[in-house]
């Protein structure tokens, strides 16, 4: 059975104390839990906690992820972090294209595609966030928006662009609102994404994983867990709670 990938995006949250009160108990709970074989956990803390987190999770199969990366490898780029630095501290997954990066940091599809490429070139796994605004959702433009965001990767990397990658469908209007699309709608969009990539790569071999993100919590993740085509979840604020992980592991 293919493992579901649960990615915990801590965003601008956390402190040293949280590593002790959340992460250490989570590691112990995960190690001894019977369902750990069906779930792959990836935690993405703020940059400053990557290295201390590495030592805490080192004796478990929990993986380290980064919320961002710069497109440059070295040089006079104050405040940035390169892919080689992330590799150096043990990062396996890198998030690119999150709607908050698109909105607040003016990242466009060209920049996002470059970040995606540099992650792949370094043999790490990129996690591409795609999704529509509420206006686009109400205007029935979800598929069109997802297509544009996917095409930016194919334009730069070609037909094999999404091999060994994760695509997280995360509608912007669902983030932090406690509102999610209907299960039927999520299934429809994930099927569209899958078939669109199959068509572009001229193959129906699924070498990528599809996730849902946006207001995922300890209640709705159980309902969504077995939805067709969902290979995992991108989780925000709920992943700051040990109870979320306990419920997930106890029920999935």
Curated annotation (Swiss-Prot):
Substrate binds at residues 9-11, 176, 215. GO terms for cellular component: cytosol. It is found in: Cytoplasm. CDD domains: TIM. Pfam families: TIM. The active site is at 98 (electrophile), 170 (proton acceptor). Its main location: cytoplasm. It comes from Buchnera aphidicola subsp. Baizongia pistaciae (strain Bp). Pathway: Carbohydrate biosynthesis; gluconeogenesis; Carbohydrate degradation; glycolysis; D-glyceraldehyde 3-phosphate from glycerone phosphate: step 1/1. SUPFAM superfamilies: Triosephosphate isomerase (TIM). NCBIfam families: tim (TIGR00419). InterPro entries: Aldolase_TIM, TIM_sf, TrioseP_Isoase_bac/euk, Triosephosphate_isomerase, Triosephosphate_isomerase_AS. Its EC number is 5.3.1.1. Keywords: Cytoplasm, Gluconeogenesis, Glycolysis, Isomerase. This is Triosephosphate isomerase. PROSITE patterns: TIM_1, TIM_2. Transmembrane segments: none annotated.
């Amino acid at each position: 059975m293919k493992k579901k990938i649960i990615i915990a995006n801590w965003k601008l949250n956390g402190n040293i104390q949280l590593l002790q009160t959340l992460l250490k108990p989570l590691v112990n709970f995960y190690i001894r839990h019977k369902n750990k074989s069906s779930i792959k956990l990836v935690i993405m803390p703020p940059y400053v906690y990557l290295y201390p987190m590495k030592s805490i999770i080192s004796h478990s199969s929990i993986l380290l992820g980064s919320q961002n990366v710069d497109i440059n490898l070295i040089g006079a780029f104050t405040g940035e972090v390169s892919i080689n630095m992330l590799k150096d501290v043990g990062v396996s997954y890198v998030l690119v294209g999150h709607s908050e990066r698109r909105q607040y940091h003016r990242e466009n599809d060209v920049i996002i595609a470059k970040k995606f490429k540099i992650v792949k070139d370094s043999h790490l796994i990129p996690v591409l966030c795609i999704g529509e605004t509420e206006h686009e959702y109400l205007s029935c433009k979800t598929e069109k928006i997802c297509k544009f965001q996917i095409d930016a990767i194919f334009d730069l990397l070609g037909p094999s662009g999404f091999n060994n990658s994760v695509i997280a469908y995360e509608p912007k209007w669902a983030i932090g609102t406690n509102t999610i699309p209907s299960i039927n709608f999520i299934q429809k969009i994930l099927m569209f994404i899958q078939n669109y990539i199959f068509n572009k790569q001229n193959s129906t071999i699924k070498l990528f994983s599809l996730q849902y993100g946006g207001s995922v919590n300890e209640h709705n993740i159980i309902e969504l867990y077995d939805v067709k085509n969902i290979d995992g979840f991108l989780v925000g604020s709920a992943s700051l709670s040990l109870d979320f992980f306990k419920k997930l592991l106890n029920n999935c």
